[in-house]
Amino acid sequence: MNFPIERVRADFPLLSRQVNGQPLVYLDSAASAQKPQAVIDKELHFYRDGYAAVHRGIHSLSAEATQQMEAVRTQVADFIHAASAEEIIFVRGTTEAINLVANSYGRHFLAAGDSIIITEMEHHANIVPWQMLAQDLGVEIRVWPLTATGELEITALAALIDDTTRLLAVTQVSNVLGTVNPIKDIVAQAKAAGLVVLVDGAQAVMHQPVDVQALGCDFYVFSGHKLYGPSGIGILYGKSALLQQMPPWEGGGAMIKTVSLTQGTTFADAPWRFEAGSPNTAGIMGLGAAIDYVTELGLLPIQQYEQSLMHYALAQLSQIKSLTLYGPTERAGVIAFNLGQHHAYDVGSFLDQYGIAIRTGHHCAMPLMAFYQVPSMCRASLALYNTREDVDRLVAGLQRIEKLLG
């Protein structure tokens, strides 16, 4: 495999630093990925040479910034194969995107007695907004359970759907188990029953190509900071026909057509009616640079490289006798585990002393922890800049902890 890993690693400045006197092994990209120099430079260039408020001025700087921002909207649409740039809404991240759908689509189209379906593997961001909506409206939440291997049984979905069911919210890739759900098949079954489908793609877009039209989903959400882009910027894709029917969630500048103290307010068309206030313009520019970066490398080569690395990591970790792995064999991005009876926090703290960064805790997936009957897990996540040497350092660190703690 000819993936240019040395060049890729050189593109990420932070990977060259040391932590606790050790070369950094960064295995926490599922929480937030490191940034290539191209993304850092893009934001710096915008702030230094081109900053201005967008959509609010006739002067050259404002016009240039507006044009660049809208160009990124088109770029995002192309990246996920949306039908139109007007189906792309800039938000702060995945969490805000799901809240926007829950509070705009949900409060407009759902009513007491309706039901929605979520899965047992969802991130809290795809649980709590629906719980809040259900509590306010009297909507029932139905939970699609997992199999023993941490996967969804497709045939179990039909039993959850009846005449009251309106919406399915499902992750494409589990942020804990790495389970890659068969979204196209899931969406087809849900759409055949008349459901609207929201797909959480936060853990998918950096690992594999995404085509929202081929998937058939109504909404698709993801964050920039996990895609090697800046923090504070994310995307909500929504089918145009739905977005045009949805009321604004937040009010303010930029999302209006007219405002009158006597005749009320009329709102801009989608997507702008959902973008109240001043946007994170620099973050949008950085997101565009991040998409350029992964597109230039190619998502298929990235996927192939990461899958090879994942298979190697699972094979090496499986040799540690006291280590418990969670999730299916075929997965993307993340490896959840526990080491004997040792608390995940202790394992993570020891690894940090060896310069190895992993994530520990419930990973914003407490229902999943309850499913496995554990309070917490360790999670190592792989990205396009990780290597077999990183995996070997992790394995050696865990073996050292095993000997130290018994």
From Swiss-Prot:
Keyword Transmembrane annotated: no
Active-site residues, as the UniProt record annotates them = 364
Q: Name one GO molecular function term.
A: pyridoxal phosphate binding
Q: In which pathway does it act?
A: Cofactor biosynthesis; iron-sulfur cluster biosynthesis
- EC number(s)? 2.8.1.7, 4.4.1.16
Which cysteine residues pair off into disulfide bonds? none
What GO terms describe the biological role, i.e. biological process, of this protein?
cysteine metabolic process
What reaction gets catalysed by this protein? Answer: (sulfur carrier)-H + L-cysteine = (sulfur carrier)-SH + L-alanine; L-selenocysteine + AH2 = hydrogenselenide + L-alanine + A + H(+)
Q: Which GO terms describe its cellular component?
A: cytoplasm
Q: Which UniProt keywords apply?
A: Cytoplasm, Lyase, Pyridoxal phosphate, Transferase
Domain of life (superkingdom): Bacteria
Residue numbers bearing the N6-(pyridoxal phosphate)lysine modification: 226
Which PROSITE patterns does the annotation name?
AA_TRANSFER_CLASS_5
The cofactor(s) it depends on are: pyridoxal 5'-phosphate
Task: Note the PANTHER family from the entry.
Answer: CYSTEINE DESULFURASE
Q: Which family is it part of?
A: Belongs to the class-V pyridoxal-phosphate-dependent aminotransferase family. Csd subfamily.
Assembly and interactions?
A: Homodimer. Interacts with SufE and the SufBCD complex composed of SufB, SufC and SufD. The interaction with SufE is required to mediate the direct transfer of the sulfur atom from the S-sulfanylcysteine.
What is the role of the protein in this entry? Cysteine desulfurases mobilize the sulfur from L-cysteine to yield L-alanine, an essential step in sulfur metabolism for biosynthesis of a variety of sulfur-containing biomolecules. Component of the suf operon, which is activated and required under specific conditions such as oxidative stress and iron limitation. Acts as a potent selenocysteine lyase in vitro, that mobilizes selenium from L-selenocysteine. Selenocysteine lyase activity is however unsure in vivo.
Q: What is this protein called?
A: Cysteine desulfurase
